[in-house]
Structure formats: C-alpha cells, structure tokens
A protein has these predicted regions:
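Gram-negative bacterial Sec-dependent N-terminal signal peptides
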Residues: 2-21
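A short helix->beta-strand "capping" segment at the edge of beta-propeller domains
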Residues: 23-36, 195-199
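Beta-strand-rich domains and repeat architectures in extracellular enzymes and scaffolds
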Residues: 30-71
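Blade-terminus and WD-like Trp-Asp/Gly-His loop motifs, strongest in beta-propeller folds
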Residues: 42-49, 94-103, 140-149, 209-217, ...
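A flexible loop/linker signature enriched in serine peptidases of the S9 family
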Residues: 54-72, 86-92, 107-118, 132-138, ...
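Short loop/turn segments that connect beta-strands within beta-propeller blades
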Residues: 77-80, 121-125, 188-192, 241-245, ...
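Extracellular/periplasmic ectodomains of large secreted or surface enzymes and adhesion receptors
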Residues: 186-187, 288-310
Length: 311
C-alpha cells in the first residue's frame, strides 16, 4: 500500500513529462512574426490601474502589410483583467497618467499631423489632443504636479528656405553648421488645445527635462550643440523657474553627465557624473542644492561629489 502511492505519482509525472515533450516544438519564422513585447508602463497615482503598451510588428505571414513596430495601448485593472484602450491603428508612445489619475496621456501623430500630446479618460470616452507645437513634433513631455500645464520638448523650427532648397535637389548637410536645436514649450491644459504654447529660452541643445515634485522648478539637460562631443563633455543641468520661465542656475559638473534626479522636496539634485574631464565614464554620485545661487544664473553653482561611507 505504501509502495503503490509513490509508483502512481511517478507514473503521473512521467505522463505529464511525455505530454509536455509532445507539445514542445522548435520555434519557427511564423512564431517570430507573431511575437509581442511590453513597451512602456505607467501606474496610476492611486495604484488601481496600469497603462502599458504592447509592441509588435505586422504579421506578414497572415497577409498584413510590412511596416514598423506598432505600440498598442492597454489598461490593466488586476490579474488577467486588461483590455485594449485604443483602436489598433493608433500607435502610441510616452504613456503616463495625469496627476489626478483621470486620464492616460500619450504622444501620437494623427494622419498627416505632427506628433502631439493626446489623452483619453480612464472611465471611457474618445481621445483628444491636449497640447501641440505648430510645425514641430513633440519628442517628450511632462505634466505639472497640479495638472494645469504640460511641458513639451519639441523639434527645431522648420527652415523654409532650407526646405525649398532640399526640394530643388540640394539635400547636403553642412557639418557643424546646420545644428537643429530642440525647443522647450509650456501649454495650458483645458477644454481646448492651447493654440499658443509659450516657448522657454534654453541655451543650446536640450536633450531631457524633469519637473520637480513641488512644481516650482524643472531641471533641463542642455549642451551647446547636438554634436556627440558636446553631449559627452559639455552637457550641463539647468535649473528652470517654472513661474518666470527663466534659467536661475547652471549646475557645473567636471566631466560627463549622466542621470539626474530631483529630491522629493525639490530642494536637491542628485547626479551621476565624472570626477574630472579625463574620467571616461559618469560613475560618481554628486549632490547640488537647487536653492543655491537661485536667481543668479551668471554665477553657476558647483555640484559636489557625495562622500560615501565605507561598508
């Protein structure tokens, strides 16, 4: 009696193993055409929902026209409880929630339009355009903490004369003489799209920006030009006063500049940077006080390496 139970269990395990082996098969090109991966993920402020995208290529094995990766917006409410939140032909990026959690926002280009910031209510309804920059695509964006403003990083303004030359056949690029600088804008969020978003003057080429949790400041990564040398060695953090739209401080770092984070109270910046111009990688943690030298951008503040305790 005691021997029968182990034998029965062994027989069941062997049967299950044989069944699994029978179902297993080599991966085929058709399988590759049907692969999907999770793209961006955003959690609602109250933690009740997760917005995410699934990235996939057209399934040419089923007759779909070949094309680029499509990102489908989905909303999850719990385990095994998720659904598509936009039509299949709307491929989005930059997914996040509005500060009050009532809307999922994303970037998308509608037909022949430039990429803009759109939103769709989480409780149902159609998507609508929230903010845009005329004649330029929005590359990234961020909400103000109170949800009243959207800050946008957009492409360079179109050079009509250069566009005319390109259409006539002159499409050469003059190295280091045709830098296309990104631009920073703020747009009011309301029932209608802000027709005249405000431009914020930032010197050089802006590559990234973050809004402080208190909504008073933003930190902007900017280099003199888009050239790779400047991106490596001359990029600096600019502290922006969101009320006046002016740069109040430039934080000097001695070498390469990596990730920048703002403290929860908005008082300090933490930065991964090099220790000097000869440091081949940004691997040292630096701290800088946001309030230091505030209002005097002509006297840049210095970021100090953070002393770490020995283990």
């Amino acid at each position: 009696m005691t021997l029968r139970a182990p034998l029965t269990a062994a027989a069941l395990l062997a049967t299950a193993s044989f069944a699994a082996q029978a179902q297993a098969r080599p991966m085929t090109p058709e399988d590759v055409a049907q692969l999907e991966s999770v793209g961006t993920i955003a959690v609602s402020p109250d933690g009740s929902r997760i917005a995410y995208t699934t990235a996939s290529l057209p399934d040419v094995t089923e007759g779909e026209e070949n094309g680029t990766t499509q990102q489908q917006l989905k909303l999850a409410y719990g385990p095994s409880n998720a659904r598509d939140f936009l039509p299949d032909d709307i491929s989005v990026s930059g997914v996040t929630f509005s500060p009050d959690g009532r809307m999922v926002s994303f970037t998308w280009a509608d037909e022949d339009e430039k990429t803009a910031v759109w939103g769709i209510p989480v409780d149902g309804g159609a998507q609508r355009k929230l903010a845009a920059v005329e004649g330029a695509a929005v590359r990234s964006y961020a909400w103000s903490p109170d949800g009243s403003t959207i800050w946008m990083l957009a492409g360079a303004e179109e050079d009509e004369a250069r566009t005319k030359q390109a259409k006539a056949g002159f499409n050469s690029v003059v190295y280091e003489e045709e830098a296309k600088l990104t631009r920073l804008f703020s747009a009011r969020v309301g029932a209608e799209t802000d027709a005249e978003p405000k431009a914020v003057a930032i010197p050089g080429y802006v590559s990234a920006f973050k809004v402080a949790p208190d909504g008073r400041h933003a930190v902007v990564d900017s280099a003199p030009t888009p050239q790779i040398d400047d991106a490596y060695t001359a990029k600096r953090a600019h502290v922006l006063d969101l009320t006046s739209g002016k740069v109040v401080r430039i934080v000097e770092t001695p070498g390469k500049l990596g990730d920048i984070e703002i403290s929860p109270d908005g008082a300090q910046l933490s930065m991964i940077a090099g220790v000097d111009m000869n440091d081949p990688a940004a691997t040292t943690l630096h701290l800088a006080d946001v309030a230091e030298a505030e209002g005097d951008a002509e006297a840049p503040g210095q970021a100090l390496p953070l002393p770490l305790a020995d283990p």
